[in-house]
């Protein structure tokens, strides 16, 4: 099951869990009423009159909640009417469809309370047979009222009601609607066989899992029998999917290290070398002689390291593999005692008396010489020029001189040793083999050589034990400390560390991976914008420094006129200082007024000034703080309301009268008396 499907399944189960109480609160079922027989022999109505010419009978059924005393009112559980079913007396047949259906169906959509009230009325109609309840002139024949309890079930409850005029036989029951179960038809269960569950519904509404499934909602498959619980899993029944590092039909076989040539494993990614092999990947042959038999002509092979060996030759042979014979006579080709002589490319047999031929195989004897031994019979051939011996059993040879060796055919398998036993032979088997010809292999695992619950594997060179966790050695006899990191549980290049206990481990994930085994990749977070932040901070600092420089320059410029003004004031004479009128005593109202200078008798240098225009540039050294020379053009500034003001000159009799305004203005006026006599100077300061 994929992660996406698991997530969808969990959401579906959550939704089911939320909706389940609501489903249990509602219910659905059917109250069934089967009319069987109605008898009205006299054709009488409830009012005592009779039907003419006969009653045309139909029924009205009203089902409602339990009432100890039945009262008229709504049929709370349902109602139904029948068409005309017969005349005075009749039997009602079962009918499953169409008009006149029997049993009558009264469905309900609530939890069945277990009690009810039922009113069955028989009516006579003179009108329509199919919808008689709407016809005018209907008359009541009889009615019966049943009050009681009724459990949900498929068994019909049969009853019969009689009165003085009529008799009604009927039966009834309550059954649940499709997919509803339980004592009150309130348990909803819909069988399904899909991704969200595989089950059928029991009579009580409980789930019954289909074969191959289990779990609360039958959504968990039952894996193949024997599938290893930890090493395998399944997404459908009878399946066994191996987890990483395991293989086999039941996921009980570990996968050795990639590249392991001649080795096995007891845990995934291990490479335990077979006997005779070494190296990291068990690819170095430590027993080359056994595996390849490089030495020829019966020579002895000795191992001398990985892929190394030495051949010890038998007499008469030489070469790296003893493949070269030293003498052509080494095979004793001459028979009947003939001697062999080596020649350049061949050999020559020197036959003893009585024999001839290339290998001294022919005899010059005849039967008269009794050449046959051990009871052999002589038979002449070629008109007496030669003979042939017919040997008795167990003897052979041209003269029956050799005892039959029944072991020459090498009948013993698997290295068994053949032994002659008179007319028969026996095989002496090597350990681990048995049988007449040593053809049966005795399992080396029968002796249970593996200790501590190790698994024995019977191989050609002997048993090999697969040890359980915590043990090692050829026979699993050595107890070792378990290393939880030995199986390589961490993925994506993570570093494994052994935890507090031997069976625990911790994976140190590389950047970009998370999870207990570092198996989940994550999106790399964007790097912090150090360049943008540094640039922004630098710009702010530069702007602050620039503002500070501008403010400092402005302060220096503003301080310079004040210093010059104070210096000019300090350079004035005491007389000039005494004739300096403070600026606070003059008010400029920007109105043209007359300025009168009264000099007494001597008026040569003084006069009356009318509409005197004040030039603010006359005394630039006395500008107020914040004023700039040349900033303001020559403008007319007039005095306001007339307030007498006297200015003293060098001549006591000379007075300057001015009209001043008491109102404040943006500018202050200063009147200076020049050091020259009989001369009045007015200076203004902005």
Swiss-Prot record:
Interacts with NOTCH4. Interacts (via N-terminal DSL and MNNL domains) with NOTCH1 (via EGF-like domains). It is found in: Cell membrane. It is a single-pass type I membrane protein. Residues 219-252, 253-283, 285-323, 325-361, 364-401, 403-439, 441-477, 481-519 form the EGF-like domain. Glycans are attached at residues 79, 109, 162, 297, 394. GO terms for cellular component: plasma membrane. The chain crosses the membrane at residues 533-553. This is Delta-like protein 4. Keywords: Angiogenesis, Cell membrane, Developmental protein, Differentiation, Disulfide bond, EGF-like domain, Glycoprotein, Membrane, Neurogenesis, Notch signaling pathway, Repeat, Sensory transduction, Signal, Transmembrane, Transmembrane helix, Vision. Residues 174-218 form the DSL domain. The lineage of its organism: Eukaryota, Metazoa, Chordata, Craniata, Vertebrata. Residues 27-532 are extracellular. Residues 554-686 are cytoplasmic. Disulfide bonds join 51-55, 62-75, 176-185, 189-201, 209-218, 223-234, 227-240, 242-251, 254-265, 260-271, 273-282, 289-301, 295-311, 313-322, 329-340, 334-349, 351-360, 367-378, 372-389, 391-400, 407-418, 412-427, 429-438, 445-456, 450-465, 467-476, 485-496, 490-507, 509-518. Expressed in vascular endothelium. Expressed in retina at least during embryogenesis. SUPFAM superfamilies: EGF/Laminin, Growth factor receptor domain. Disruption phenotype: Conditional knockdowns in retinal progenitors have thinner retinas with occasional regions abnormally organized into rosette-like structures in the outer nuclear layer and an optic nerve with a reduced diameter. Residues 186-188, 192-196 are annotated as: Interaction with Notch1. One of its GO terms (biological process) is negative regulation of blood vessel endothelial cell proliferation involved in sprouting angiogenesis. Involved in the Notch signaling pathway as Notch ligand. Activates NOTCH1 and NOTCH4. Involved in angiogenesis; negatively regulates endothelial cell proliferation and migration and angiogenic sprouting. Essential for retinal progenitor proliferation. Required for suppressing rod fates in late retinal progenitors as well as for proper generation of other retinal cell types. During spinal cord neurogenesis, inhibits V2a interneuron fate. Residues 1-26 form the signal peptide. The gene is Dll4. The record marks 111, 217 as: Interaction with Notch1. Gene3D superfamilies: 2.10.25.140, 2.60.40.3510, Laminin (2.10.25.10).
């Amino acid at each position: 099951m994929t992660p996406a499907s698991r997530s969808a399944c969990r959401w579906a189960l959550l939704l089911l869990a939320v909706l389940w109480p609501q489903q249990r609160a509602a219910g659905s079922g059917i109250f069934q009423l089967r009319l069987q027989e109605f008898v009205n022999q006299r054709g009488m109505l409830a009012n005592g009159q009779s039907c003419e010419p006969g009653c045309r009978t139909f029924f009205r059924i009203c089902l409602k909640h339990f009432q100890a005393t039945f009262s008229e009112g709504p049929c709370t559980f349902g109602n139904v009417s029948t068409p005309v079913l017969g005349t005075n007396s009749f039997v009602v047949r079962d009918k499953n469809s169409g008009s006149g259906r029997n049993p009558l169906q009264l469905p309900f959509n609530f939890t069945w309370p277990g009690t009810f009230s039922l009113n069955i009325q028989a009516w006579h109609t003179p009108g329509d047979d199919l919808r008689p309840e709407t016809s005018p002139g209907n008359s009541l024949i009889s009615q019966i009222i049943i009050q009681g309890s009724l459990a949900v079930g498929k068994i019909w409850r049969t009853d019969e009601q009689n009165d003085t005029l009529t008799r009604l036989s009927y039966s009834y029951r309550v059954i649940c609607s499709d997919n509803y179960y339980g004592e009150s038809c309130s348990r909803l269960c819909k069988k399904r066989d899909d991704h969200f569950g595989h089950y059928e519904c029991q009579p009580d509404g409980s789930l019954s899992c289909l074969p191959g499934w289990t779990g609360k909602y039958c959504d968990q498959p039952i894996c193949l029998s024997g599938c290893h619980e930890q090493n395998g899993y399944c997404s459908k029944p009878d399946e066994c999917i191996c987890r990483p590092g395991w293989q086999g039909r039941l996921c009980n076989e570990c996968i050795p290290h990639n590249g392991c040539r001649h080795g096995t494993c007891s845990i995934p990614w291990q490479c335990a070398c077979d006997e005779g092999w070494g190296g990291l990947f068990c690819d170095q042959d430590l027993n080359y002689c056994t595996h390849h038999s490089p030495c020829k002509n019966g020579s002895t092979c000795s191992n001398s390291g990985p892929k190394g060996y030495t051949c010890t030759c038998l007499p008469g042979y030489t070469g790296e593999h003893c493949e070269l014979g030293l003498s052509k006579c080494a095979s004793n080709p001459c028979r009947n005692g003939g001697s062999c002589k080596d020649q350049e490319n061949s050999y020559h047999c020197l036959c003893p008396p009585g024999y001839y031929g290339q290998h001294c195989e022919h005899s010059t004897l005849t039967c008269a010489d009794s050449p046959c031994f051990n009871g052999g019979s002589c038979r002449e051939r070629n008109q007496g020029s030669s003979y042939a011996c017919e040997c008795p059993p167990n003897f052979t040879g041209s003269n029956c001189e050799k005892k039959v060796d029944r072991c020459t055919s090498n009948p013993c398998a698997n290295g068994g040793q053949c032994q002659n036993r008179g007319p028969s032979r026996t095989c002496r088997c090597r350990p681990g083999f048995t049988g007449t010809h040593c053809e049966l292999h005795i399992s080396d695992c029968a002796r249970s050589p593996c200790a501590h619950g190790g698994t024995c594997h019977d191989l050609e060179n002997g048993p090999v034990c697969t040890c359980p966790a915590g043990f090692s050695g050829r026979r699993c006899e050595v107890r070792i400390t378990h290393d939880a990191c030995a199986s390589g549980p961490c993925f994506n290049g993570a570093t494994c560390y052994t935890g507090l206990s031997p069976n625990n481990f911790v994976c140190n994930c590389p950047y970009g991976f998370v999870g207990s085994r570092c198996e989940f990749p994550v999106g790399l977070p964007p790097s912090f914008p150090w360049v943008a932040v540094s640039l922004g901070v630098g710009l702010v600092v530069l702007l602050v420094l620039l503002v500070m420089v501008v403010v400092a320059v402005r302060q220096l410029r503003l301080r310079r006129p004040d210093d010059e003004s104070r210096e000019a004031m300090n350079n004035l004479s005491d007389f000039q200082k005494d004739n300096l009128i403070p600026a606070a005593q003059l008010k400029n109202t920007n109105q043209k007024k007359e300025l009168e200078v009264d000099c007494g008798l001597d008026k040569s240098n003084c006069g009356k000034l009318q509409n005197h225009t004040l030039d603010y540039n006359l005394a630039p050294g006395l500008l107020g703080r914040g004023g700039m020379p040349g900033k303001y053009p020559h403008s007319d500034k007039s005095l306001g309301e007339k307030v007498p003001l006297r200015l003293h000159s060098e001549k006591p009799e000379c007075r300057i009268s001015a009209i001043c305004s008491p109102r404040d203005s943006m500018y202050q006026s200063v009147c200076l008396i020049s050091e020259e006599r009989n001369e009045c100077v007015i200076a203004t300061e902005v």
